């Protein structure tokens, strides 16, 4: 049986975290990127993680952050997986001795084809839409057909996903993990419970 896993990213409050967890999210993303409208600090992150039930993975998202700050956050917040969304290389990402996911901002098929060789130590790759000045959470999507024949390292689909299009996205790409942020929001940084539930329910329905 294939289980399509879901990550709800950009969680900013314990209430949103709890709702997503109870709706069946496999993972929740905390954004430690000050320029993001969904950014959290250590205090907020501690409150969110303290509210979570067992067996919900917490993912910390960083964008070109210093190693010193990353270590400080990892020491104070219970993080299971790190997601690097900037211009980090494999050597930088692996130094924290924590499973990591590397976001790949897709422009062409070669971005997908070369990703596994560039990040051999990544637990998984996350394919997201390219934007010249923003690192994720843009609401943009890329050409999903580029992933239709991909069979490399485990991967996650992101970029412009919503409750309305995640069905199509999974069918085209064969994704076994999907990541959403803006597509399930009432406003930037605030999740819409109905959208979160609908997104997860669709992914669960397509599991087999």
Curated annotation (Swiss-Prot):
The gene is trpF. Belongs to the TrpF family. Coiled coil: none annotated. NCBIfam families: PRK01222.1-4 (NF002298). One of its GO terms (molecular function) is phosphoribosylanthranilate isomerase activity. Keywords: Amino-acid biosynthesis, Aromatic amino acid biosynthesis, Isomerase, Tryptophan biosynthesis. It catalyses: N-(5-phospho-beta-D-ribosyl)anthranilate = 1-(2-carboxyphenylamino)-1-deoxy-D-ribulose 5-phosphate. The keyword Amino-acid biosynthesis applies. The lineage of its organism: Bacteria, Pseudomonadati, Pseudomonadota, Betaproteobacteria, Neisseriales. Pathway: Amino-acid biosynthesis; L-tryptophan biosynthesis; L-tryptophan from chorismate: step 3/5. It comes from Neisseria meningitidis serogroup A / serotype 4A (strain DSM 15465 / Z2491). InterPro entries: Aldolase_TIM (IPR013785), PRAI_dom (IPR001240), RibuloseP-bd_barrel (IPR011060), TrpF_fam (IPR044643). This is N-(5'-phosphoribosyl)anthranilate isomerase. Its EC number is 5.3.1.24. GO terms for biological process: L-tryptophan biosynthetic process.
């Amino acid at each position: 049986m294939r289980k399509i896993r879901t990550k709800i990213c950009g969680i900013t409050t314990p209430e949103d975290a709890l709702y997503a967890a109870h709706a069946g999210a496999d993972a929740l993303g905390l954004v430690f990127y000050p320029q993001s409208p969904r950014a959290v600090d250590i205090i907020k992150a501690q409150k969110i993680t303290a509210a979570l039930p067992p067996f919900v993975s917490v993912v910390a998202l960083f964008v070109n952050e210093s190693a010193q700050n990353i270590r400080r956050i990892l020491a104070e917040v219970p993080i299971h997986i790190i997601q690097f969304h900037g211009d980090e290389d494999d050597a930088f990402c692996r130094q924290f001795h924590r499973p990591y996911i590397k976001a790949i901002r897709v422009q062409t098929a070669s971005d997908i084809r070369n990703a596994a060789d560039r990040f051999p130590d990544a637990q998984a790759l996350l394919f997201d839409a390219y934007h010249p000045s923003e690192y994720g959470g843009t609401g943009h999507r890329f050409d999903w057909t580029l992933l239709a024949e991909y069979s490399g390292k485990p991967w996650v689909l992101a970029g412009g996903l919503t409750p309305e299009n995640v069905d199509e996205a999974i069918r085209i790409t064969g994704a076994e993990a999907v990541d959403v942020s803006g597509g399930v929001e009432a406003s930037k940084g605030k999740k819409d419970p109905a959208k979160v539930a609908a997104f997860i329910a669709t992914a669960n329905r397509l599991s087999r």
